[in-house]
UniProtKB/Swiss-Prot annotation:
Protein's cellular compartments: Cell membrane
Glycosylation-annotated residues: N5
Transmembrane segments: 30-47
Region (Required for DVL/RTFL small polypeptide activity): 20-51
Keyword Cell membrane carried by entry: yes
Protein name as annotated: Small polypeptide DEVIL 21
One Pfam family recorded for the sequence: DVL
Domain of life: Eukaryota
Keyword terms of this UniProt record: Cell membrane, Developmental protein, Glycoprotein, Membrane, Transmembrane, Transmembrane helix
GO cellular component: plasma membrane
Organism field: Arabidopsis thaliana (Mouse-ear cress)
InterPro entries, alphabetized: DVL
Length: 53
């Protein structure tokens, strides 16, 4: 019983760390997507500015 209680605590801690890591990865992906979106807008503006010159 003691072993299962300890392993339960370890699993709980492991799951918590995995959740934190997943949230950090999600945040990083979201930031990268935002950066790519801004770059895409800038490139579109640069390419379309040639049409008006």
């Amino acid at each position: 019983m003691l072993v299962s209680n300890i392993s339960g605590k370890l699993m709980s801690q492991l799951m918590e760390k995995m959740k934190e890591r997943l949230e950090k990865m999600k945040r990083t992906v979201r930031q990268q997507r935002a950066k790519l979106h801004i770059i895409r807008i800038c490139i579109t503006m640069l390419l379309s500015s040639d049409d008006y010159s």
